[in-house]
């Protein structure tokens, strides 16, 4: 007999003003991963993604908000970070390290891609989805 296992997704939504005081938010977002062997790596990647959303997406405007959804599944923890900006162009979403060490942009995306198991962008480019496998926890 074939049984279908239904495992509900659990998610939490966070809405916060654009600010660079992100340490408490990062800590809260990482609560389900507090025993992860790669916690420092995830913390670094989330911090970078949030700073990019505040600085570049929302232009540092404290009147704009970030929307973050944390999704827990049996095998993954997923963070979706959305800003109010016009989005990152497809051509700028590289996971490669910039050729020039003094390049003004691109290092953050390289770092983010190396901190998470899966990185995806919305079509518009103003929502970034980051995922970490739970078996690494």
List where the protein language model places each region.
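Flexible, glycine-/charge-rich segments associated with ATP-binding catalytic modules
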Residues: 1-17, 113-137
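Glycine-rich/acidic phosphate-handling loop/turn and adjacent ATP-lid/helix
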Residues: 78-105
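Conserved ATP-binding N-box helix of the HATPase_c
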Residues: 37-62
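Solvent-exposed beta-strand sheet faces enriched in polar/charged residues
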Residues: 69-71, 82, 122, 131
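Short beta-strand/loop element within the Bergerat-fold HATPase_c
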Residues: 65-75
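Bergerat-fold GHKL ATPase/HATPase_c domain
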Residues: 1-44
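Glycine-rich phosphate-binding loop
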Residues: 101-116
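A generic structural signal for beta-strand entry/edge sites
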Residues: 74-78, 125-127
């Amino acid at each position: 007999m074939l049984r279908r296992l239904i495992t509900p997704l659990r998610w939490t939504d966070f809405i916060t003003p654009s600010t660079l005081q992100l340490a408490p938010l990062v800590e809260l977002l990482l609560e389900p991963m507090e025993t992860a062997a790669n916690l420092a790596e995830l913390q670094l990647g989330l911090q970078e993604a949030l700073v990019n959303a505040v600085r570049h997406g929302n232009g540092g405007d404290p009147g704009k908000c970030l929307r973050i959804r944390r999704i827990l599944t049996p095998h993954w923890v997923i963070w979706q970070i959305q800003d109010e900006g016009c989005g990152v162009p497809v051509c700028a979403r590289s996971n490669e390290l910039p050729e020039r060490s003094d390049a003004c942009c691109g290092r953050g995306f390289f770092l983010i891609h190396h901190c998470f198991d899966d990185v995806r962008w919305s079509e518009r480019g103003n929502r970034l989805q980051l995922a970490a496998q739970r078996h690494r926890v």
